[in-house]
Amino acid sequence: MIKKILTTCFGLVFGFCVFGVGLVAIAILVTYPKLPSLDSLQHYQPKMPLTIYSADGEVIGMYGEQRREFTKIGDFPEVLRNAVIAAEDKRFYRHWGVDVWGVARAAVGNVVSGSVQSGASTITQQVAKNFYLSSEKTFTRKFNEVLLAYKIEQSLSKDKILELYFNQIYLGQRAYGFASAAQIYFNKNVRDLTLAEAAMLAGLPKAPSAYNPIVNPERAKLRQKYILNNMLEEKMITVQQRDQALNEELHYERFVRKIDQSALYVAEMVRQELYEKYGEDAYTQGFKVYTTVRADHQKVATEALRKALRNFDRGSSYRGAENYIDLSKSEDVEETVSQYLSGLYTVDKMVPAVVLDVTKKKNVVIQLPGGRRVTLDRRALGFAARAVNNEKMGEDRIRRGAVIRVKNNGGRWAVVQEPLLQGALVSLDAKTGAVRALVGGYDFHSKTFNRAVQAMRQPGSTFKPFVYSAALSKGMTASTVVNDAPISLPGKGPNGSVWTPKNSDGRYSGYITLRQALTASKNMVSIRILMSIGVGYAQQYIRRFGFRSSELPASLSMALGTGETTPLKVAEAYSVFANGGYRVSSHVIDKIYDRDGRLRAQMQPLVAGQNAPQAIDPRNAYIMYKIMQDVVRVGTARGAAALGRTDIAGKTGTTNDNKDAWFVGFNPDVVTAVYIGFDKPKSMGRVGYGGTIAVPVWVDYMRFALKGKQGKGMKMPEGVVSSNGEYYMKERMVTDPGLTLDNSGIAPQPSRRAKEDDGGAAEGGRQAADDEVRQDMQETPVLPSNTGSKQQQLDSLF
């Protein structure tokens, strides 16, 4: 009877086993063909960030969620490979993808618990899961994982599997792969890890947060000890090595990639261009983009602009806290503030801080990045003292939770604020259009709006040279005499009213030459010139410089620069004067490399004198250059003469009520445009002239940019002649008699006080010297041939 029962039981068990094996076999036969292809493993391309460099190799931008450096398995030190194997898969080199003994142990534990509580995933299984499967704990997912692991083992070598694991695994702190983790946790190359450091990192794959040595040092230490004991058990290390590693004091030094903060506007321009071409792949394919800007030029340009904006803001009242965080519900105020401050940047030595308390004496206790606390007394508060708990300032008052800026002045902290005034600087290679420096504002972090390329502003008198160039092309000369006298134009004002434009300084010089008029920036002369050549002709001609029709008003006000354009476009247009009349295109990208170091794209720029289209007659460009040299020598931009160079030319610009101030200066090699103004246009007051606020920025930058470069000046082209100190096109030494100039009107005589006063010239500079007025020679001119620009042929960047 017992024998019969045993036989029956054995038969049932055997039957169930056969049935189970059959089911498993069927499941394998059904599932295995449906497993995903291993192409992503065999041709592994990890997500790598977009990195942007200056021309001299400085990192100026990095974009992408995953910070990763792909490393060959042979470049990982043996001590790290052993530590990971000891921690995750001691039988890695001895199994076929699944550790059967480990599975058995885990199965027993899961049966006892009644659910999937633990596994025995090998490194190969983890690779399968990380690349193809979810993290859910189900028997179906585990079954697929086992089959995938087997398939991987049949297709890839053990070292290749290990290489995939070492590069793909997430290890906390935004570190993907052990090479990245070595930098982030210890700030060192993975090849330089000690045994103790390797064992610590090897503990992270199991639970990156739980075993993070920075956040949970005690748990991480226990995990490290476990791994070292495993290594000893596997005869990977000796007892002495284990003990030394356990006693080694580890120093955690988070790696912070230094990104040049002065070129963030340039980096953002590149990011946008790459995103337009590649979409989200731009952030994962490991592109390395080299730009045309130099890091040292960027630093000088940024400081030059910031200096002017700071100086303008000096003496302004305190505008209030820049932000506010609610600390009333925080259980750990110090940690809350630290987390908040970690997302802010120190800009121009202005350090972000959060107010923790305001004392009865109205002293302010602040917390700085790093946790340091500082008490600011009334002296340290300075101009911000009135804002302390001032209910009249509403949300902008200084109170608990207020975010403010402070600066360390010789060991004493004081409240400061970022200036409200903004600006931009653009510097181009005149012959190629390559951007050498570009600053889009005071601080990219607070306002990413790039004023160099996005701010549409009136260029004011910096636009006049284009009108004068059109006049030379139409039949005038640099010595054409025009009456600088008031003029009234019926029907040209708002709603058909009378337009009575004025010179900005209220002074009129009577009959003066074009050279004198541009040097002193005379509005009346510019208007009379445009009346003579015609608005339509001027629009058509000025488009040769790269301006769009929408930027050129179809009215006489165009002569005063009332159209709107960007600083970059103005700099690009001035390059036509600088390079002898050729149209070049601005660009910031020079080369693009892929993750493997292969050159993917290289800019082939239009070059003046080679493949760039001729925009204007080179003689026209030369004569304009010589006229604008006088603007620097004796005119509204005399501040630029501080460089002591004879090859500089340029033009200032100031719009109505001093809302926008400009200076564009150049020599035959470099064009630099500076714009200053508020984001919400308003008057800058008495100092808001191009000659007083924009020129100093230009000088500070160009002093560096032109250092060591000889000032040769522009070479006079063929067909230009000089007579009585003036320059003419050979065939045109007189004004075209077919042109009609309205020289009516009488210039009012200045008062005796005005005669004695040197100041108050156009745009706030000193009055330009009154050269002797030259009368035109009465000869019949020969008009030049058509010099309209060709269609640009800029090679595709991608």
Swiss-Prot record:
GO CC, alphabetical: outer membrane-bounded periplasmic space; plasma membrane
Compositionally biased intervals (Basic and acidic residues): 768-777
InterPro entries per record: Beta-lactam/transpept-like, Glyco_trans_51, Glycosyltr_51/Transpeptidase, Lysozyme-like_dom_sf, PBP_transglycosylase, PCB_OB, PCN-bd_Tpept
Species in which this protein is naturally found: Neisseria meningitidis serogroup B (strain ATCC BAA-335 / MC58)
Transpeptidase, as annotated region: 378-700
Reaction(s) catalysed by this chain's protein: [GlcNAc-(1->4)-Mur2Ac(oyl-L-Ala-gamma-D-Glu-L-Lys-D-Ala-D-Ala)](n)-di-trans,octa-cis-undecaprenyl diphosphate + beta-D-GlcNAc-(1->4)-Mur2Ac(oyl-L-Ala-gamma-D-Glu-L-Lys-D-Ala-D-Ala)-di-trans,octa-cis-undecaprenyl diphosphate = [GlcNAc-(1->4)-Mur2Ac(oyl-L-Ala-gamma-D-Glu-L-Lys-D-Ala-D-Ala)](n+1)-di-trans,octa-cis-undecaprenyl diphosphate + di-trans,octa-cis-undecaprenyl diphosphate + H(+); Preferential cleavage: (Ac)2-L-Lys-D-Ala-|-D-Ala. Also transpeptidation of peptidyl-alanyl moieties that are N-acyl substituents of D-alanine
Keyword vocabulary terms for this entry: Antibiotic resistance, Carboxypeptidase, Cell inner membrane, Cell membrane, Cell shape, Cell wall biogenesis/degradation, Glycosyltransferase, Hydrolase, Membrane, Multifunctional enzyme, Peptidoglycan synthesis, Protease, Signal-anchor, Transferase, Transmembrane, Transmembrane helix
Function: Cell wall formation. Synthesis of cross-linked peptidoglycan from the lipid intermediates. The enzyme has a penicillin-insensitive transglycosylase N-terminal domain (formation of linear glycan strands) and a penicillin-sensitive transpeptidase C-terminal domain (cross-linking of the peptide subunits).
Active site per the UniProt annotation: 88 (proton donor), 461 (acyl-ester intermediate)
Disordered as annotated region, ranges: 738-798
Bias type Polar residues, positions: 783-798
Any single Pfam family the record assigns to this protein: Transpeptidase
UniProt topology in membrane: Single-pass type II membrane protein
GO biological process, one term: cell wall organization
Topology, Cytoplasmic side: 1-9
Protein name: Penicillin-binding protein 1A
Location, primary (coarse class): membrane
EC code(s) of this entry: 2.4.99.28, 3.4.16.4
Compartmental location: Cell inner membrane
GO molecular function: penicillin binding; peptidoglycan glycosyltransferase activity; serine-type D-Ala-D-Ala carboxypeptidase activity
